[in-house]
């Protein structure tokens, strides 16, 4: 599998997380309960898999090699800006989850779940839009064979560094299992 195909494979996982985030948001807006712990798990996956691992591979390995090919630097600049948007949404979600958790510890009622619902929805929209644009870009790279075998091998080595930076293969596998756990929760059951 090429490094480009590897990134598109990650996008399949990331989109599944987007479905979970959207479902959580929809349920919260409908005043239905979603366990705080489940939303915290989704937040961890956003931070560790999407940001540290996947965006790390793109930002530290893939984009530096492809940015000077056929004027791709403007596309890559936009993707980097979008990555920062995703990070900001995830941080704002985390901030609201900390407040919610604090209210639980103190035995008080968390006043409004609307900010959590809003940031989950924003993240789901970000994921859908961003991965669609990146897949179009990656397909262009693949179709035009813009990466040499040597470049592919070099990027692959950096991918391994990104995997180690995010906790290694066992941690990535754990994050995959956590997403499967979320997908099988009762509040996800009526998702088509």
Could you tell me what each predicted segment is?
Residues 1-192:
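Small-residue-biased structural context
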